[in-house]
Structures are given as structure tokens and as C-alpha cells.
Amino acid sequence: MINQKEGFKSGFVSIIGRPNVGKSTLLNHVIGQKIAIMSDKPQTTRNKIQGVYTSEDSQIVFIDTPGIHKPKHKLGDFMMKVAQNTLKEVDLILYVVDGAEAFGPGEEFIIERLKEAKTPVILVINKIDKVHPDDLLSLIETYRHKHEFEEVVPVSALQGNNVPTLLLEITKHLSEGPQYYPSDQVTDHPERFVIAELIREKVLHLTREEIPHSIAVVIEQIKRRQHQDTVYIGATIVVERSSQKGIIIGKQGKMLKEVGQQARADIEALLGSKVFLELWVKVQKDWRNKPQHLRDYGFREDEY
């Protein structure tokens, strides 16, 4: 921990909400760097991702949890367990909802979890750029009747509207405390984890509905080539069926090449170095229901 001036505030804040309400977009906007994987498919975020925001007078450590849902397999069980445990560990919860969607059973389910956790909650209504002001006021009233929120802050995570106000509200609810991380550090995840997430994001984005969330990415090797000032990265994309392997590779390898090109650009921005990225695709049947494979592919409750 780092010495800081008197009155410095710090704390751990969980970002929670249904799939695809913009949790990862919000975290990435605040941090100013792509840390949490973004996709329009549910359950994109699998591990708790710590993003660190530091200002002159505060440090906020964000935990981005998987979208809360009813589990369908062991991977789903793992993701839900991570989400529920997080609620009890943090100082403050940001409950993110989609302002363009009506209150429904999914929101009821989450609010019940919030009541059990007994942690202070700020309601963040996202995507306000898509909502009429009258509808927004009505939605705020609906949520206020369901739970006692510390604050309600409407934002557009994609455009950055009202995000500075949200950061001020978060800081207001934190206690005085130490600076846990250096000012220039934005995550505590190892490089391998972030690189794997960037590759997985490109697969999900480029294959759209053809590939469900039955993929994992394993970083086989990261090697810095000093004389060439480049970083060599070898990674395996794991799928459950041969048909999925064919889709990811694509005709004459075109899809895999495109995944590699797009992922490489993000990885180079992350590392600040030229990157040589080599990708392979492997079939591992039904890996999401096998605890050993979940551990092999990085899903460890005690780590994240």
C-alpha cells in the first residue's frame, strides 16, 4: 500500500446487473482502457475483473461480476457463485440497469439478492441516450419503490454522459483509506488473463450468433523477443464441437485470420509493443460441465 495525503478515500465497488446492460462498457469508460470484455451476448464477463480508478483524492477498485442469471451448467454455477460472493465482500454496489427496458422478473431476482447482501447500493440507469426523459422519470420511481438505494444516477456508459457525476457519488460513499495500487495501475489481473479476454471478445464479436459462449482461450506462451522488439503470443481457442471449430477457422482460414488481426491490435495497445500472435483451435467436448477443464481454463473461484 502507498502513503497518501490526509483525507484520501478508497474502497471496493461491485458492478452488478443483468447480462448486456452495459457493465463492462461502464468499467472500460471509467478506466479509460479495455479491461472487461464487451459483447452483445449474455454472460460475456466470467471472472471478477478488478479495474482501478485513481484520482488525487481517492482510489476506487471496481469488481465487474458476471451477469446474474439462473445457471444452466457448471460454468453457470461458477459464474453465479462469483457474483453472489462479490456482493458481500465490497463496500458499495453499483446496480446497473438498462434504461430502455421495463422493470421485470430479472430485476426482481437481483433486488432480492441485493437485500440479502445488505451492502449500500447506487442504482445506475444506463443507456439514457435511448430513453425519453418522461419514461426515465417513471422508471426511476418504479425502482425507488422496490429498494432503498443510496443514490440513483442516470448515465450513458457508451458516450460517457454523467459518468463523472457517478464517480463523485461513489467517492462520497467511501471511507478514508489507503491507496492500494500505484496511480498508473488499472487492473490487478495478469497480462495472460487480459490477453485471453481480448482474443475471446473478438471471437464472440466476429462469429455473432454462430458461436455461443462455449469457448475458452488458453494462452500457451508469451515470449518477448528483445532483438526484434516484439512479443510472441501463442494461444489456443477451445470449443465444444467440431462444427464450432470450422466456423472459427472459416473458409481458407479467413475467420481465424481476422480474429488474430483484430485481437493483435488491442493487445499491442495494451502492451505497448509489436505483437506476433499465433492462434490454434481445439475441440474439448462438453468442457463447461467438467470441473477439471474449468480449472484448466482459468475459472478458479479463489483467484478472481
Curated annotation (Swiss-Prot):
PROSITE patterns: G_ERA, KH_TYPE_2
Region called G1, residue ranges: 17-24
Region of interest: G4: 126-129
Ligand binding (GTP): 17-24, 64-68, 126-129
Keywords: Cell membrane, Cytoplasm, GTP-binding, Membrane, Nucleotide-binding, Ribosome biogenesis, RNA-binding, rRNA-binding
Subcellular location: Cytoplasm; Cell membrane
Biological process, per Gene Ontology: ribosomal small subunit assembly
Region (G5): 155-157
Membrane topology term: Peripheral membrane protein
KH type-2 domain boundaries: 199-285
Keyword Cell inner membrane: no
GO cellular component entries: cytosol; plasma membrane
Pfam family membership, one: KH_2
Region (G2): 43-47
Annotated segments matching region G3: 64-67
UniProt function note: An essential GTPase that binds both GDP and GTP, with rapid nucleotide exchange. Plays a role in 16S rRNA processing and 30S ribosomal subunit biogenesis and possibly also in cell cycle regulation and energy metabolism.
Classification via PANTHER family: GTPASE ERA (PTHR42698), GTPASE ERA, MITOCHONDRIAL (PTHR42698:SF1)
Subunit structure: Monomer.
UniProt family annotation: Belongs to the TRAFAC class TrmE-Era-EngA-EngB-Septin-like GTPase superfamily. Era GTPase family.
Name the record gives this protein: GTPase Era
Provenance organism: Halalkalibacterium halodurans (strain ATCC BAA-125 / DSM 18197 / FERM 7344 / JCM 9153 / C-125)
Origin organism lineage: Bacteria, Bacillati, Bacillota, Bacilli, Bacillales
Gene name for this UniProt entry: era
